[in-house]
From Swiss-Prot:
Binding site for Mg(2+) 2: D177, D179, D231
Alphabetical UniProt keywords: DNA damage, DNA repair, DNA replication, Endonuclease, Exonuclease, Hydrolase, Magnesium, Metal-binding, Mitochondrion, Nuclease, Nucleus, Phosphoprotein
One of the record's GO molecular function terms: 5'-flap endonuclease activity
Primary enzyme class: hydrolase
Predominant location: nucleus
Disordered: region residues: 356-385
SMART domains registered for this protein in UniProt: HhH2, XPGI, XPGN
EC number annotated for this UniProt entry: 3.1.-.-
Protein name per its UniProtKB record: Flap endonuclease 1
Region (N-domain): 1-105
Region feature (I-domain): 120-251
Amino acid sequence: MGIKGLNAIISEHVPSAVRKSEIKNFFGRKVAIDASMSLYQFLIAVRQQDGVQLASESGETTSHLMGIFYRTLRMIDNGIKPCYVFDGKPPVLKSHELSKRSARRATTEEKLKEAVEEAEKLKHERRLVKVTPEHNEEAKKLLRLMGLPYVEAPCEAEAQCAELAKAGKVYAAASEDMDTLCYRTPFLLRHLTFSEAKKEPIHEINTEILLQGLELSIEQFIDLGIMLGCDYCDSIRGVGPVTALKLIKEHKTLENIVEYIESGQANNKWKVPENWPFKEARQLFLDPDVVKGSEVDLKWSEPQEQELVDFMCKEKGFNEERIRSGIKRLQKGLKTGVQGRLDGFFKVKPKNKEQLAAANAKAKSTKAGKQATKGKVGKPGRPRK
């Protein structure tokens, strides 16, 4: 689910923390990718023209395999070395969120039964998409045959991605879940595994600049995330992004905020959930269950060509000519290796407050200018009234 409203806070207060780039700008980078999130995207997006998921002759879904194969090839074509990270057992504190998701699925299943229009049916079918253990195992097999490393996290994949980035094993964590920032990844990449056809730039969020711009410690940022709403507990009812940021700046900790609300001094519309486990949620972000980065050895190797063809073509029904062509791209990309980047020879100094304020003002001005220009576009040759 991620953290509700965090994007809006970043856009409003620290736009300079986000850099929008083309995929080619990450040449030479190793990246840890949230596999479960990626597989979910592929199962929803990789479909036939009629909107139906890709499937083998035996009826097995293959959208996830096509997504992994071709989106990974695109990364390798652009000099990126990906490592996929798979979810382990969810923490007990997440059971409430998982129960809510199950309830939503049951409601969607009922709506699907009642749907008449084909478009309505497809909409509900997409909402019912779920990554199964079988999907995960097939994805792992494909990655092994492609010669690419993957890590099985003991718990949350985003936390493990962040740990690999903190340990210097990879440059960044890649996920659509904003709560990855609460696990203290130095950099978060969003939209990395999106389709090229979407023409969506990759968003690179710099955690150091983000915290500096918000003037929050990592502990306060985590408290902000919990207050906005995360997978581990409900949020404070009636408190939105603007109010949450104001409260954390004024009161510094969730303990103080809860005391302030329950003392009767605050807005009586705000309601702290009963037995709110915010301390336990905070601890899951500060000390997640992960394999230490120093213990992980990531290796990229030659693809097993014939075994890969047997799996993808003979077993799953993909076109052999296209798969072999993809294998050649894979071999070429992996032989290139991770070349040195010019910025690797320099240490970038963090911005001071004045520089950060100027960068944020420039980012806001650019955004406002684009919106104003967009609003003034009219039909050519027709005078304005």
